[in-house]
Amino acid sequence: GASGIGLLRTESVVIKELTEAQQVEAYKTCIKNSGGKPITVRTYDWAADDCGQWMDGVQTRMEEETTALTQLSALMQAAVEAPEGALQVLFPMIPDVDAWRTRMDQMKRCNESLKEKGLPFCGNLPVGCLIEIPAAALMAGEIIDAGADFLAVDLDDLVQYTCGVSRREKPTPADNPAVLRLVQDVMHAAQTRGVPLYLCGIMQKDLETMPAFMRIGVRNFCVESVHINTLKSILMQTEL
C-alpha cells in the first residue's frame, strides 16, 4: 500500500566499495524493482548506525568528497532508467546553508564531468534535505531558497538532538512539545514555498504519536514496510 520508497539507505554500496559502474547497476535494479513508483535515495551517511563506530575519525575529508562524487555520478546515470522525477536524492548531515551549497556544487561538478565523458545521465534530479538537527530545522526556509526541492524530517534524530537524550536512555516521546514546534516551523517553511515534506525515522514506539503530527499539517509519512498497515489504521482513526 505504499506510494513509493521514501528512504533508500545506501551505506552498503560504499562499505562494499562498489565501483561507480557497479553502483549504477545497483541503482538501476532498484528502479526496475520499484515498478515506476518514486524512490528517494539517501546519499551515504557517515554517521549512520550501520556504518559502525569504527568509521569515526577514519575517513578523511578527501575520502568523503570522492565517495560523494562517485555516488552522485552513479545516481545521475542510473536515473535515465526512471520516469522523470521518480528518482530523488536526499542529502543527510546538512546543518546549515553552507553545507547544502557544498552538495549543490558537487552535483554541478558531476554534471559537468558526465557531459565531458559523453555519458547518458539525468542532470535535473530532484534534491532534498534531511532535517536531523534543530539547526537545520531553524534554517529550513533558507535551505529551500538555496535549491532544495523537498524536505524530509528524520524524527528519531530530531528527538534525540532536540531533547539532548541518548538512544540508550529511556525513550523520549516523538510528540514532545519542542519537537512538534520545530516540525511545525519546518512545515511552515515548506508550505509557504510550495515544497513537499514528509516524516521519516519513525520508530515502532512512535507510531501512536503520529496523529499529533498529522494535526499540525504533516500528510506524508515514511515507515518500514512492516508498519505501513498499522500506521494507516492509526491515521484513519485520527480526528483533525
Question: Which positions does each model-derived feature cover?
Answer:
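Conserved alpha/beta-domain cores
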Residues: 1-240
